[in-house]
Amino acid sequence: ALSSAASDVYKRQVQDLRDAAAYLPHRVTVRAGDFPDLGACDVIINSVGKIELLYQSHDRLTEMDYTVPAVRSYAQKIKDSGFDGVLINITNPCDIVTRELALGLGLPRGRIFGTGTGLDTSRLLSALARQTGIDHKSITCYMLGEHGNQQFTPWSCVSFRGMPLDVWAEK
């Protein structure tokens, strides 16, 4: 179920997801809905945002004055729907909004995730694979910290085929 304030965008997103579902290996139902319908969902992707705010600044905190009040305005509606699944947050500032959702929904630990550094870890992994020619499945690396300008790579945790970066670099 999708729930959105922007009805034209909403309708296009519903259709895009319906079209994409044909390629999934399992049955997925995509339908338009509103907050009460979210109780029947297994997964919610939180993607509220106003991308125009980033046109003035590349700092993800710029979006906070919009996204945090938005989340606060509907978290109780999600909770009231009886939603008991997994929520994945992709909204910026990712860490802050994920925390707001956790507080507002009161779901058990491990049921609300923010994708912030997960996406950046994938980007780092892809870059290291391109640079080294090593298959990405043979590389271990992480981005940690707050998604955005405050994240970092703990280089001491990077390994190639199980070999620590410093050992690999000497070869």
Language-model segment annotations:
Residues 1-6:
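Single conserved hydrophobic/aromatic residue that forms the stacking wall/gate
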Residues 8-41:
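Conserved N-terminal Rossmann-fold NAD(P) cofactor-binding segment
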Residues 18-22, 99-110, 129-134:
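Short, surface-exposed basic-aromatic patches at helix termini and helix-loop junctions that form
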Residues 44-46, 89:
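Redox-cofactor binding/interface segments in oxidoreductases and associated redox assembly factors
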Residues 48-50:
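Conserved NAD(P)H cofactor-binding loop of Rossmann-fold oxidoreductase domains
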Residues 52-53, 96:
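Short glycine-rich, flexible loops that bind phosphorylated cofactors or substrates
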Residues 59-117, 122-125:
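Rossmann-like NAD(P)(H) cofactor-binding subdomain of soluble oxidoreductases
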Residues 115, 122-171:
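Substrate/ligand-engaging "lid" and interaction regions
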